[in-house]
Regions:
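Metal-cofactor-dependent catalytic cores
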Residues: 1-176
């Protein structure tokens, strides 16, 4: 497991993610804690979030509409996973897109495939499970002030327009 300073150094070496248009690199359906599927395509709806995802089944956040779908930047997931499977953070979409506060603020709408998602006010932060999987250094890195501003842990979204999303689809800012 990497330390906070190692993660920061490695992150600084990575090319910046695009601000306006990127791609969907991975789809993750959370079946149960620690159990994930990684389909090549998925339906996204207002009623269920990602089809089959435990959000739609009323898990721990009790179907909080502001947490329907979670996104994380792929390069950050690669760093914290450190060779482990990239689905382990449990975010629904891993994207090559800058999710920082300065790039995509609350209310920003993103088109991923045919679906449109809106970034919500709910912060997406690391927790005990995140620390157990990736170490205290990773948790500190994503949750410190700078990590929160860069949204290293990702963002929570609600579904505005339902539709299909596929791995390789564009993810782009529709409105800021």
């Amino acid at each position: 497991m990497r330390t906070q300073s190692e993660l920061e150094s490695l992150f600084a070496e990575k090319p910046a993610a695009p601000r306006d248009r990127g791609r969907v690199d991975l789809l993750v359906v959370r079946l149960a804690p620690g159990r994930h599927l990684t389909p090549g395509r998925i339906e996204v709806s207002r009623e269920h979030g990602l089809s089959g995802d435990r959000w739609g089944k009323g898990w721990s956040f009790r179907r909080d509409v502001d947490r329907q779908v979670t996104l994380m930047t792929t390069s950050v997931a690669e760093l914290v996973c450190d060779g482990q499977p990239l689905h382990l953070p449990g975010d629904n979409l891993l994207v090559n897109l800058d999710l920082s506060v300065g790039s995509v603020g609350v209310g920003t709408r993103l088109r991923a495939g045919a679906a449109v998602l809106e970034i919500t006010r709910k912060p997406h932060l690391g927790c005990k499970k995140f620390a157990a999987r990736f170490g205290q250094g990773a948790l500190d890195w994503v949750n410190d002030e700078q990590g929160r501003a860069r949204r290293l842990r990702g963002v929570n979204c609600r579904v505005v327009v339902p539709g299909e999303v596929r791995v390789g689809d564009a993810v782009e800012v529709v409105s800021r």
